[in-house]
Amino acid sequence: MFKITRKGFTLIELLVVIAIIAILIGLLLPAVQKVREAAARMKCQNNLKNLGLACHNLEGVRGGLPPSSVQSPSVIDIPGLKEFQKSGTTGTLAAHYAKHCFLSIILPYIEQGNVLKQAGGAYDLTQDWYAAINRSASGTRIPTFECPSTPFGHSFSTSSLSAAEQTTYGAGWTLPTADYMAVNRSNNRAIIWTTMGLTDPGVNSDSIKGVLASNQFTRLLSVTDGLSNTIMLAEASARPQDRRLGKLANPLAGGASPYMNGAWAHSGNDIAIDGSNAAGSTLSAAADVPTACRVNCTNQGEVYSFHSGGANICMGDGSVRFMSESVSLKALLTMAARADGNPPSE
């Protein structure tokens, strides 16, 4: 009688199988990551489209696009900001106007009625965004304001701030963040424009203001460079962290920090697109122009994302584009200004 023996895998065969599986995983993982990032980038673009649409829906009701921010308005701006006047004040001083950013102002136009009711009533634009009546709503995460590609946790605690800031904004309060900012102006240094061979639009003129400007509702006709040629919103991801060239430059905001405006409701949620030098600082001298960094250089006041090769922007007409890191400085600065008069450049 013959005895039948079962032959199993030898150690070498098992190791070969494991090696093949490891190779397959190594080949498939980058593909999976690319698909995941493509989906995140598309979601990010859809968020910007919704925000752009909300701005235009408000324009249809109000007759102007929303202010990028309302804080410390000038005497010239005050007459157009009556809906932000604090109750019980005469409305004659800058301090009589509540502080808000465009994201708070467009809340009713992005179907966020539930957020407006968090404090037991409508979000009150006549009180500062951090006032007690608005704190519950301001402390609520809104997915439309967040890009899924951003690795930062989309919230931070006021406990990380200085004692003075905690006195102003409240202690132990968790603030949700936003990855999208309004572009309120372009570079305001004449030397930068003339070094690039462009006409200086005037450092204090309306020409360098963005589609959404500080302390004023923008009439569409004032965007003389064309809505489709001018940036309205852009990614400036991961604030309040200080990110430079893909790396964390400083830890979470603390002390007397300018990065508090990572909170989505913060009245400083607008950026001036200036371009930056290699250190991540604003361009201020002619020598900075040849080596200027344009996109994904720093998230402190510039266009910044965690997408490979560029960042998403929303134009004045509501269309969304992917701006490459290789965009020229000329194109970037002229696209940030609504009426500089210089022809579009690529």
Enumerate the predicted regions with their spans:
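Surface-exposed loop/linker segments characteristic of extracytoplasmic
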Residues: A40-E346
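N-terminal single-pass transmembrane signal-anchor helix
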Residues: I4-C44, N50
